[in-house]
Amino acid sequence: RIKTVDDLENLLLGAYNGIRSSGFWGGRTLRGFDVIADDGVADVATFEWVQMSAHTMNLVNAVGRDTWTATYNAINMANQVAFSDLGESILASDPQKEAQFKAEASFIRALGYFHLVRAFGLPYAEETKDIAEMGVPLRLRGVMDRATAFEVVQRSTVSEVYSQIISDLEYAIENLPGENKVESGRATVDGAKALLAKVYFYKHDFGNAAKYAEQVINTQKYDLDEDLTAKFGRAEKK
């Protein structure tokens, strides 16, 4: 049972661990994106991969189902930490942890919804961004009981999902602790800026994409790959 700030931190670490699952960023979901986009080839005749290659996925496709479940599980753990009555009441006793945990939870939630809207929503475009139910359901409060878990949440528009992602990342950038105070593997300001640059790129807002990418590049803390073409040869295994 969650009673203390330490309990909430363990739950937050569970949300980070959820990112590593195969249905989120742990492996086969990302490979599935490559197969759907024809950047990769399904060279095995298994049901899931053949469906994805042919763009005929249905509800029983294990890769799609795991993507949905694992990502929403991580989002819900983040919501339980910082965006639930219980989490908020516990964090009220420690304002420093409150700001940090809310920023980290916002980052995880943004990453999750960016993953989901690209997998299950329409691409962001002026002609489709405001069509009802073409995004994914937005759950912004932690689900703490079975009754709430089974409530039907309608899909939001693509525009609404992207607006939430951007709002969460802006909050994370403003409130994440400095990099020297962050344990390895946890969200950083530069990580949030890099993700926000990618979000704006997918939104076709190239000015803001360049703005946040340049902020990360200009820190001079990271090396840039000088030969991207080398990463896409058939023999490339990285």
Task: Annotate the PLM regions.
Residues 1-34:
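Acidic, glycine-rich segments characteristic of secretory precursors and extracytoplasmic regions
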Residues 5-8, 12, 160, 204, ...:
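Extended ligand-binding clefts on enzyme/binding-domain cores
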Residues 106, 193-200, 212:
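TPR/Sel1-like alpha-solenoid repeat signature
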Residues 75-78, 162, 169, 213, ...:
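Inward-facing hydrophobic residues that define packing positions of alpha-helical scaffold repeats
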Residues 48-121, 156, 173-179:
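Conserved, well-structured interaction surfaces
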Residues 119-159, 163:
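Short coil/linker segments at helix-helix boundaries
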